[in-house]
């Protein structure tokens, strides 16, 4: 049986439909075959008709595969027809493992847009050996969470003249006059993640997938309060810790660098840049409110049933409008600190940090446009740039899998760009 280059699973969902639309519109995918997959053939056909109307490219007769995360046989049949499965069905802690299992067992690589560290790391624990034996790649967090951040640190390491010691990143989501609301599916994933945090046993998983002790630089990251003022000469504002998957993904990439590439690992911290302290306090209170109420079944059900009201309309069942997405964008700032001197990996620097570098990553709407561009770039890399991937299959982070590839060019074609802004001695 011949395989499609890409199968988009969950193509009738809110995010999945955008992934298919940007695939159809991308010149990078010309000459590649694709299919859409999901539970309802009717909904999938409707998505294809809508995309045909929006793009002016007739894909109404594109291949459709009916598959369901609760039906192992259908997932196996889907995976047997794919070179790469793009999995856009979340929450992944509920529906993701069956798709990974089917892909690995049937010789398909798998990328997804999960931002759920516990699930992501459990997939490495359970499937990395089998994926390596099959020669396929499983790469999670290939959406906006966490390609911009993980590949941003990788970009900084490659462009730092000397030995990089630590990085602080700041991300800001920019909205237009129409405002912005994320789709409620992201909110439901957040609720599940908070409620499952106590039982995830993530520490034990990490000891298994990262058994070796790696040595990072002697200079530690600055200790920051939960809410603090940014006072870089290139950036000001207020910062709070970033609650997403970026830090966990980057730390796994640093482990891979140290143990597999013999590249010096760095210390890392991730933050959100806010325009005011008042907004920071509101976000903090909301997260505290969620963290308390997810513990109790009754209040958790209320949170799940009323995402609009319980998130103060930051999340909506309807998701953002087309205008809101068109007006939205994001920017990452990566501040790197290190030494202009280069030492062997097993030697530590002495003395003060003496070099600083700033890089940025900019792109369109983070939630859906950039996420589509990121996961499609990951799929393209698996298809077109195999020579620059790790030699063996397995479960990898984005930087571990794609750090030496052409993915930066693919990302740029979707409007996601990296720039070295400055580098100077301290």
Curated annotation (Swiss-Prot):
InterPro entries: NAD(P)-bd_dom_sf, Saccharopine_DH-like_oxidrdct, Sacchrp_dh_NADP-bd. The keyword Membrane applies. The chain crosses the membrane at residues 278-298. It is found in: Membrane; Lipid droplet. GO terms for cellular component: lipid droplet; membrane. It is a single-pass membrane protein. One of its GO terms (biological process) is glycolipid biosynthetic process. Pfam families: Sacchrp_dh_NADP. Keywords: Lipid droplet, Membrane, Transmembrane, Transmembrane helix. PANTHER family: SACCHAROPINE DEHYDROGENASE-LIKE OXIDOREDUCTASE. Belongs to the saccharopine dehydrogenase family. This is Lipid droplet localized protein. It comes from Caenorhabditis elegans.
């Amino acid at each position: 049986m011949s395989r499609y280059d890409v199968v988009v699973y969950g193509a009738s969902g809110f995010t999945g439909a955008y992934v298919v639309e940007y695939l159809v519109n991308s010149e990078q995918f010309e000459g590649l075959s694709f299919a859409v997959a999901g539970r309802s053939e009717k909904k999938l056909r409707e998505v294809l008709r809508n995309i045909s109307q929006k793009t002016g490219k007739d894909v109404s007769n594109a291949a459709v595969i009916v598959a369901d995360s609760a039906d192992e046989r259908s997932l196996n049949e889907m995976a047997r027809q794919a070179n790469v499965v793009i999995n856009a069905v979340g929450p992944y802690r509920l529906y993701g493992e069956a798709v990974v299992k089917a892909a690995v067992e049937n010789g398909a690589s798998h990328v997804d847009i999960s931002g759920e560290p516990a699930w992501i790391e459990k997939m490495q624990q359970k499937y990395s050996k089998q994926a390596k034996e099959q020669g396929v790649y499983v790469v999670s967090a290939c959406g906006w969470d966490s390609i911009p951040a993980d590949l941003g640190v990788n970009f900084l390491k490659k462009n730092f003249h000397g030995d990089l010691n630590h990085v602080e990143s700041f991300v800001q989501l920019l909205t237009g006059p129409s405002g912005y609301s994320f789709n409620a599916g992201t909110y439901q994933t957040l609720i599940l993640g908070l409620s499952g945090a106590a039982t995830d046993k993530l520490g034990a998983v990490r000891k298994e997938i990262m058994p070796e002790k790696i040595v990072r630089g002697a200079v530690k990251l600055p200790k920051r309060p939960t809410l603090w003022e940014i006072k870089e000469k290139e950036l000001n504002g207020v910062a709070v810790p970033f609650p997403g998957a970026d830090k966990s993904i980057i730390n796994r990439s640093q482990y891979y660098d140290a143990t597999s590439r013999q590249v010096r690992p760095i210390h890392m911290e991730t933050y959100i840049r806010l325009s005011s302290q008042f907004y920071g306090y509101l976000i903090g209170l909301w997260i505290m409110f969620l963290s308390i109420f997810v513990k109790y079944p009754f209040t958790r059900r209320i949170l799940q049933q009323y995402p609009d009201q319980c998130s103060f309309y930051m999340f909506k069942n309807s998701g953002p409008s087309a205008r809101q997405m068109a007006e939205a964008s994001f920017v990452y700032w990566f501040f790197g600190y290190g030494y202009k001197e280069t030492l062997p990996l097993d030697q530590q620097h002495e003395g003060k940090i003496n070099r600083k570098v700033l890089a940025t990553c900019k792109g369109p709407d983070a939630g859906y446009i950039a996420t589509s561009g990121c996961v499609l770039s990951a799929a393209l890399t698996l298809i077109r740039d195999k020579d620059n991937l790790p030699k063996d299959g397995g479960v990898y982070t984005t930087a571990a899998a794609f750090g030496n590839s052409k993915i930066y060019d693919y990302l740029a074609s979707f409007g996601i760009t990296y720039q070295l802004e400055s580098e100077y001695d301290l």
